């Protein structure tokens, strides 16, 4: 994992490890709403891998799982606050 140096403060940020590698999760289920909702912000957008720390493989899986859960109406496309 590459260390990132911030230009503004010259601090070194160590990236987060991939949650799915640490917990040794092999299958991500779209029906697991608690896990899926961790990767969505309060506006309903999918969080990037820079924020979540996921590797590219698991980030792709998470985005597909979120899209599948939205279609099955398990999670909303947008939040209630934005709809009004």
From Swiss-Prot:
Q: Name one GO biological process term.
A: translation
Which GO terms of the molecular function aspect are on file?
Answer: small ribosomal subunit rRNA binding; structural constituent of ribosome
Spell out the GO cellular component terms annotated for this protein, sorted alphabetically and separated by semicolons: cytosolic small ribosomal subunit
Give one Pfam family. Answer: Ribosomal_S18
**Gene3D superfamilies reported for this sequence:** Ribosomal protein S18
Record key words, sorted: Ribonucleoprotein, Ribosomal protein, RNA-binding, rRNA-binding
In terms of InterPro entries, this protein maps to: Ribosomal_bS18, Ribosomal_bS18_sf
The UniProt family comment states: Belongs to the bacterial ribosomal protein bS18 family.
Please give the PANTHER family that the UniProt record associates with this protein.
30S RIBOSOMAL PROTEIN S18, SMALL RIBOSOMAL SUBUNIT PROTEIN BS18M
State the function annotated in the UniProt record. Answer: Binds as a heterodimer with protein bS6 to the central domain of the 16S rRNA, where it helps stabilize the platform of the 30S subunit.
Q: How does it assemble?
A: Part of the 30S ribosomal subunit. Forms a tight heterodimer with protein bS6.
Report the protein name in the record: Small ribosomal subunit protein bS18
Gene behind the chain = rpsR
